[in-house]
Amino acid sequence: MSKISTKLKALSAVLSVTTLVAGCSTLPQNTDPQVLRSFSGSQSTQEIAGPTPNQDPDLLIRGFFSAGAYPTQQYEAAKAYLTEGTRSTWNPAASTRILDRIDLNTLPGSTNAERTIAIRGTQVGTLLSGGVYQPENAEFEAEITMRREDGEWRIDALPDGILLERNDLRNHYTPHDVYFFDPSGQVLVGDRRWLFNESQSMSTVLMALLVNGPSPAISPGVVNQLSTDASFVGFNDGEYQFTGLGNLDDDARLRFAAQAVWTLAHADVAGPYTLVADGAPLLSEFPTLTTDDLAEYNPEAYTNTVSTLFALQDGSLSRVSSGNVSPLQGIWSGGDIDSAAISSSANVVAAVRHESNEAVLTVGSMEGVTSDVLRSETITRPTFEYASSGLWAVVDGETPVRVARSATTGELVQTEAEIVLPRDVTGPISEFQLSRTGVRAAMIIEGKVYVGVVTRPGPGERRVTNITEVAPSLGEAALSINWRPDGILLVGTSIPETPLWRVEQDGSAISSTPSGNLSAPVVAVASSATTIYVTDSHAMLQLPTADNDIWREVPGLLGTRAAPVVAY
């Protein structure tokens, strides 16, 4: 084992929180931003075509919108489509709106010298400073006036800002994760940014974003350990050079090294990496770093974690392996379970059971040593925090409750978490699931899908904030949700033609999964690193995530409408 690995393991031991279950059945102790345009100064690797002679007005406008995907040289490519006077007054940096598509219609009153064209489309997002995607769902309308200049049509009046069709965003920008630690210091959390593909300095863009800190949407849920004096100087002589890091102790420097190395590595920036802080190696003993040196912090390590499939059938839980179905012991086979979550690594089961007219949240080991920790009229399917350090459920459709073990008494305690919904969002929460990192929370409210950020206002306190609708195109059809290990959100719906959808965590894209032999509604969904499991109107089905579009019944559960539970 390398010296840095030894040091990392020691640090991890200090930072780690205790797991939800210790031994067989116990719960743990509680324990000057740069905008996107400033990154665009590097030259593009592609020559951009400008207006062509005798181009028709509608084609010229479409060429203008396409050129707006190139932010280099203050959007010089797009300005080539404007009249000379408008070039100096148009402000492309005002906003970047993403539309599903752009429709054009010439308005009445047009002449051979001047035309006004209406622009319409559904705005599905906005690209904010630093490449942050903010999902939207609103109709967009604007007008563009065109005049002839030297015999050629040019745009003479238009709204400030850039309009991009979603396809142009995908064709010319790529999402990259900038990594920040969760409050426990255990796990790196991706902060997704859309960056221009053809920048010749992607690594420097990423390091500048890292130093600038997390985006506003996720910042309440992660840690930014750098002071406002920190800055990224640049990439010089093979070194990533930073200043203003003198306040960081050894552990903080190690964490920052992990952030930088994994941010670069996941953007396919080749290592090894030399990180220099204030003129000296960031880590004095390790001037050059590789991902192997910091493997303990690999943000995708859990995507390779071994998982176990369980099935909830007729109110009882069973382990499913190679076609064999083995019922769990004791209370877990009592026939009264409505939903469940299982952590095989911590040997803990959390299940919502029904007793008479109330729901009961029961927690314990797989061997059956259990405790009833919550009772209420309704309780949502449980969900575990990272490393099973606590579990959550929503009571009576409105109050998230966190269950963990008190550091003072050693007893299981329930703490209500505050949830800050947008003003126009009302209705009961029918599904609530934490991401694998525990920093994001997805929920279904009145059939709509929302994602928020879990924050820690004080010791033992939790709040879910910055809640945004991420799949408005699904309407009110969502029934079930599950986070894939890679951070993609799976959504089961009642839509007959396409009952299962995948949603990017920032809401930038939504796409249907193969649905040839799926029958709506999809009332349950779960996933491992390699397989998606669902319960449709007939049975429990599985689909390998790689290059496969045929859903098949799960061996051992043929003809059975069980609900999948994937445990890690």
From Swiss-Prot:
Pfam families in the record: Germane, Gmad1
Lipidation (S-diacylglycerol cysteine): 24
Cellular compartments annotated: Cell membrane
Keyword Lipoprotein: yes
Keyword terms, alphabetized: Cell membrane, Lipoprotein, Membrane, Palmitate, Signal
Highest taxon of source: Bacteria
InterPro entries per record: GerMN, Lipoprotein_LpqB, Lipoprotein_LpqB_C
Main localization (coarse): membrane
SMART domains tied to this protein: Germane
Range of residues in the leader sequence: 1-23
An annotated GO cellular component: plasma membrane
Membrane topology category: Lipid-anchor
Covalently lipidated residues, kind N-palmitoyl cysteine: 24
Family: Belongs to the LpqB lipoprotein family.
UniProt xrefs under NCBIfam families: PRK13616.1
Name assigned to this protein: Lipoprotein LpqB
Source organism of the structure: Corynebacterium glutamicum (strain R)
